[in-house]
Amino acid sequence: MKPGIHPEYKASTITCACGAVVETRSTRGSFTTDVCSACHPFYTGKHKIMDVAGRVDRFRKKYATAGK
């Protein structure tokens, strides 16, 4: 590697909106994020099921005559 052309690689703290803190190394430094593996629904298993039955019925009613 050439000396003097690479960015400084230093300790970094990543803080999530939920309060989780991750210590790592980065060229960016410390920063915050909105979601992490501690609070993201995919990792926590707390998926939200949306009720879209009304929308589906409205779509079918609107385009019922288009296929005939």
Curated annotation (Swiss-Prot):
Q: Which of UniProt's keywords are assigned here? A: Metal-binding, Ribonucleoprotein, Ribosomal protein, RNA-binding, rRNA-binding, Zinc
Q: Which Pfam families match?
A: Ribosomal_L31
Q: Which domain of life is it from?
A: Bacteria
Query: Which residues are noted in the entry as Zn(2+)-binding?
Result: C16, C18, C36, C39
The cellular component terms of Gene Ontology attached to this UniProt record, alphabetical and capped at eight, are:
ribonucleoprotein complex; ribosome
Record GO terms (molecular function): metal ion binding; rRNA binding; structural constituent of ribosome
Cofactor(s), by name: Zn(2+)
Q: How does it assemble?
A: Part of the 50S ribosomal subunit.
Q: What is this protein called?
A: Large ribosomal subunit protein bL31
